[in-house]
Amino acid sequence: MSLVGISLVLVVLLTTLLAGGVWIGVALLATGWAGMQFAPGGIPAGSVLATKVWGNSASWELAALPLFIWMGEILYRTKLSEEMFRGLAPWLNRIPGRLLHVNVLACGIFGSVSGSSAATCATVAKIALPELKKRGYDDMVSLGSLAGAGTLGILIPPSITMVVYAVQANVSIIQVFLAGFLPGLVVMVLYSGYIVAWSLANPQRTPPADPPMSFREKLRESGKLIPLMLLIVLVFLSLLMGWATATECAAWGVLGSLAIAWWHGSLTWPSFWTSVMGAMRVNCMIMLILAGASYMSTSMAYTGVPQALATWVGHFNLSPYALIAALTVMYVALGTALDGISMIVLTTAVVIPMIKAAGFDLVWFGIFVVLVVEMAEVSPPVGFNLFVLQTMSGKDSNTVARASLPFFFLLVLAVAIITVFPDIVMVLPRMAFPA
């Protein structure tokens, strides 16, 4: 059978399994098994399956994944969202948009220790939505800023999505982590800039400022954020200075999260075991997907489909910018049907050869992928952040999707910025790992 025929058979099989509700990991394993039947030389599919699943699961780099997930689960069950709102609100009261900026900053802070977009969105929305509604803030901007800012959970390290990409693309997790810091700040500035512009254009829809507080009172309100800020600085410096590997940083992050939960009085045996079980469920799901993706990628490599596809795309002589534009459209389309991790594991084996041929750095491409995954998080019908806010606000899905639309286009702008100015992404990895 020709490579085109093999590709069609595998795509139809995978699509059928996913449409039938089969678990993504199982669908990938089944498609990989089918792909091995087309491999030349009679390579035993069972032996390759055992080798790839074990090799993928026993990776030292992947040991960071359950730890980062657990760290986010621990903090998700603390009073952190309440303390962040109270601690940040007094400092932002005089900026146009006022407390709407708390959504952006709080999501940025929590995202830097949670690694999950949905957890970040849910944690901040839990306290922010009632407070903003009570003060009379516009529902659409409140929902949109939470949907958009919630995506910072996977852009500002540590990030579960970044770990998955780094393992799939065989690049340094630490370098991908470091590459995400400045783009994360750029996205936060874009979000806050939009809120300022909207507020200035709609002053009648912005509530009056809260009564002013003295500097001493502001410090007292922000005091409980100090342990969290110290944890963020410690993780960042450990990565930048090379004091610890990503897995070691994750372990220290778990200990720091437990300490913060104890500090807030939220660490009980029930909450501890709930966080353990929550992290275990998420990790098992992701590990099964990664095992299936690894097996399917190997089977596709044996058939020669990715290399042939990369060669075919190369015949179009696309410029680097045109290739990135085409990939952006492809990922946005995939994001309407798949979650971010599934998008990464399904496309990495095919896309990486094209990216290498175009001369892009794989660390830079990792941040590009994270940004387009963020777009998927706020794209109907399967955007996780939209589901979270729909549940927490009681609004219908169309309303939440419309509210998030301006922030979707801000993410498109962020992709354009890092494409034109790639040093925004690469400066920290180059500082930490000079050539």
What does each model-found stretch correspond to?
Residues 1-435:
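Alpha-helical transmembrane segments of multi-pass membrane transport proteins
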